[in-house]
Each structure stands twice: as structure tokens, then as C-alpha cells.
């Protein structure tokens, strides 16, 4: 069965934000790609790096690796960080490891990591 682009677009438009985030994650894993625009700049940085001596990374991705033993404080922290509702934040936390924020500054990434680690979560910055 072949789906038309319009049918796929209509199906996606009826999905919740959480379902769309999970779909994007599944597509990234299946095809080995990333939806982050920072990867385009990463390719440009590699080209520039080969021409110059050193390029410093300026955009970072914050990844919730695991929630630890205390799920409720982690859900509250994720809600405040992402602005999601309770159910969406809970679903997101339970699907760890998951990307929480992309293309953030080093300071913001460190602050998010400290916040999440203070409530028992394991966080990775890439």
C-alpha cells in the first residue's frame, strides 16, 4: 500500500505533540538521521575546522538518559524546562533516553543538567 504525501501529512496533523516527538525519534533511529538543524552547522564546522586550527562547539543538545529512582521530581523538572503538560512530560520522562532541548548554549545546557541531576536524573550533553 502506497501512501500519498498528503495522506501522511493529514495523519501527522491529527497527532498529539508527544506522538509527533516519538515519530521523529523513530524516524531518526530507522534512517540514521537527525531532525536537529545543528547537524547542518556541524557539517559546516567540520569543513571550517579542516581549514582552520580549531572550532569550538556553540550549540548543545540536552538528553535525559535515565530518571533514577524518583520519577515525580524529574517529571516536574521536565515540565518546567519544556513547558509540556503533566501527561506529556510523564510520557517523555518514561521514554528516556530522550532529547529534551536542542541547540542550546553551553551555559543553558549546564544549568539544565544541574537542575535535572539535582532531582536524581542522569543527563547527557552532546
Swiss-Prot record:
Entry superkingdom: Bacteria
Name this polypeptide is given: Large ribosomal subunit protein bL12
A biological-process GO annotation: translation
Subunit structure: Homodimer. Part of the ribosomal stalk of the 50S ribosomal subunit. Forms a multimeric L10(L12)X complex, where L10 forms an elongated spine to which 2 to 4 L12 dimers bind in a sequential fashion. Binds GTP-bound translation factors.
Keywords: Ribonucleoprotein, Ribosomal protein
GO annotation, cellular component aspect: cytosolic large ribosomal subunit
One term of GO molecular function: mRNA binding
Free-text function comment from the UniProt entry: Forms part of the ribosomal stalk which helps the ribosome interact with GTP-bound translation factors. Is thus essential for accurate translation.
KW Ribonucleoprotein (keyword) present: yes
Pfam families in UniProt: Ribosomal_L12, Ribosomal_L12_N
Similarity comment text for this entry: Belongs to the bacterial ribosomal protein bL12 family.
